Amino acid sequence: MVASARVQKLVRRYKLAIATALAILLLQGLVVWSFSGLEEDEAGEKGRQRKPRPLDPGEGSKDTDSSAGRRGSTGRRHGRWRGRAESPGVPVAKVVRAVTSRQRASRRVPPAPPPEAPGRQNLSGAAAGEALVGAAGFPPHGDTGSVEGAPQPTDNGFTPKCEIVGKDALSALARASTKQCQQEIANVVCLHQAGSLMPKAVPRHCQLTGKMSPGIQWDESQAQQPMDGPPVRIAYMLVVHGRAIRQLKRLLKAVYHEQHFFYIHVDKRSNYLHREVVELAQGYDNVRVTPWRMVTIWGGASLLTMYLRSMRDLLEVPGWAWDFFINLSATDYPTRTNEELVAFLSKNRDKNFLKSHGRDNSRFIKKQGLDRLFHECDSHMWRLGERQIPAGIVVDGGSDWFVLTRSFVEYVVYTDDPLVAQLRQFYTYTLLPAESFFHTVLENSLACETLVDNNLRVTNWNRKLGCKCQYKHIVDWCGCSPNDFKPQDFLRLQQVSRPTFFARKFESTVNQEVLEILDFHLYGSYPPGTPALKAYWENTYDAADGPSGLSDVMLTAYTAFARLSLHHAATAAPPMGTPLCRFEPRGLPSSVHLYFYDDHFQGYLVTQAAQPSAQGPAEMLEMWLMPQGSLKLLGRSDQASRLQSLEVGTDWDPKERLFRNFGGLLGPLDEPVAVQRWARGPNLTATVVWIDPTYVVATSYDITVDTETEVTQYKPPLSRPLRPGPWTVRLLQFWEPLGETRFLVLPLTFNRKLPLRKDDASWLHAGPPHNEYMEQSFQGLSSILNLPQPELAEEAAQRHTQLTGPALEAWTDRELSSFWSVAGLCAIGPSPCPSLEPCRLTSWSSLSPDPKSELGPVKADGRLR
């Protein structure tokens, strides 16, 4: 009783405090319930057909001079409203949910469910203990699949030889896109589970303990000192892909010497580049192209296979008596002259130069994923489970760019030593094998004392930008990639005491000025008046590849560009020449190039066969289409002065902070990203509003920009198809404008590479169901934004959904002409049209002179540059 009375007394005394505490707890509970309800609601719409469980996230970032980062993972996202901001060294700017939206669940249209993924049940063979297929019995590695996105689930159509239980292996089987790849994965996993895939122990021949890595300094005066023996000769292995033939020619021009040898492997997917390289090699006896080609994906086992096969080829070419093997990519460039490199290697002719990770081995093994089993198929590296490092050896690794002696290459290629044979088996199922195989073989061999911990390169690592898991669509791991050099990085290229002779990476589509600076530093300036020193061209389409490599958006845009240009030729011609300047396009464009000047994108160059309206043969014309800027900076406050640019596009590259889709060509099925660039200044919170062509407010969200934030970007999860036509993105603060930009969602004239049919146009050009781009409606913002009444725009949009043929082309051309203008036309051959000058005489045509990327004959000193 006494205790009860005391409790009652305490309750009466502190009843106000207790009531306040209960109220706070109740409020917190309501908030938690509200947000969990939003997540559950989204999960109910998006999660009914769940994909296989994501891979477990790893931790940490990339190792020094190694491309591996951490285990791949999609990571969990809490709802749809997490955005990203990029700001090195400062907290991430946040995208927060706008409070101006209202829920409209009653009219929500759920997306079509994805294909049913295979179950995660155990997979068993026909009988336990059935004999396993040996490694030699595997099907060949498939060339199918795409590195543009992770392979999609398919039905199980294979027969595993054992019970597969590991979660990594089951996930890989569920995601592999072909039966052949699934069978390969099952065979590898069964062999591994039986203990017959990986070597248990590997012999070590090196008698040294610890790492043998003598430091070698470099003094430029050494290049003038007499050599010990004849100057060394180098076999350059160039591993290239993509379409940047002009940058490759520029690299070859810089490193070429008639005493060296050049062997070029072009990725199997890069047919245009292969044709150009084959033509290039015909002019030089010491330049050859591999007669075979492979698909070499980032981090894949195929890269090591390609190197070993290339090394064997180089050893067996008659008359190629080389001393060193140096691998390069098209994004490399020399930082010292050939004379300096030859002098240095001649004084160290018995050394092998490989860059090590520079940290304890156990951590490197974890970061690099060496304790995990991988297999490559469908152009993807699949993580299949854990494994043990073989006993008896020291595992090393780091960079996959190296300088190796001929004797070591012969040992790796020809030896029967169990050390090499068993390590080749181990690295066949290893992520990034070229970053570790040669290091580990050398450090455990009798030649271990020849190792120098320096690969003679300087690499532009910026891990805050380069380690963003950008390869997770190719490998089940998080990887890193170096950044491109820019002029502000030039001091890093001038290593004085450390011997470095090459640098990477360089991309002329990102920055060509730094190459000009480096080239001038090495070889001096070009003669005065040399053309095209600031210009750069890169092919993006060639008719020999066929239209299959083009998206419907690009095919639509390129053909529309040709029509706009030919119309311009007729209207811009002098009156007397008008009949001679009327053309009709014939077929599809024959080629398309990106054109840059002074490191700014200048537009597309389209080469098109055109039939004159007057009598005469068809002519080949090249047309220059230039994008028109649409950014408006509207604010007058200090916060508004922070905004530098506002862009919308696709293929955003967070490492280089640019859109790889130059010009922002996008269609109804694309997923655009809005990117803002900021100067430093006071913190601010801004609202981003997207408005479609019929004045539907598609979405609205807030971004918080910290003091030192440089870039913010967010891709709203808009329902598709997007309505074709001009869109507007506004940036506001307290509903006062800071900036505005317009972008075009292009009406498509092609669908699956065929002219658009009416039944396809009726849904592809109609916008999303019920005009709802999000699960919430933002149309209540129309009055705040002072948007026009939508009725007329809606009627026009409805008419547009019925267009096909010439009427559809006219609409597409009309919309495109609001964002692009014809900047030039020229004739590749003779033309009676007086307003068309020859392309070779222009400064902008892809056929105009480009001396910096033209090779020419070998000079008296054995060089090209």
UniProtKB/Swiss-Prot annotation:
Residues that bind UDP-alpha-D-xylose: 239, 267, 296-298, 400-401, 481, 504-505
Protein name (Swiss-Prot/TrEMBL): Xylosyltransferase 2
The encoding gene: XYLT2
Organism of derivation: Pan troglodytes
Coiled-coil segments: none
Catalyzed reactions per annotation: UDP-alpha-D-xylose + L-seryl-[protein] = 3-O-(beta-D-xylosyl)-L-seryl-[protein] + UDP + H(+)
Any single biological process term in GO: heparan sulfate proteoglycan biosynthetic process
Disulfide linkage: 162-190, 206-448, 467-480, 469-478, 581-833, 826-839
Keyword hit for GTP-binding: no
Glycan attachment residues as annotated in the record: 122, 327, 683
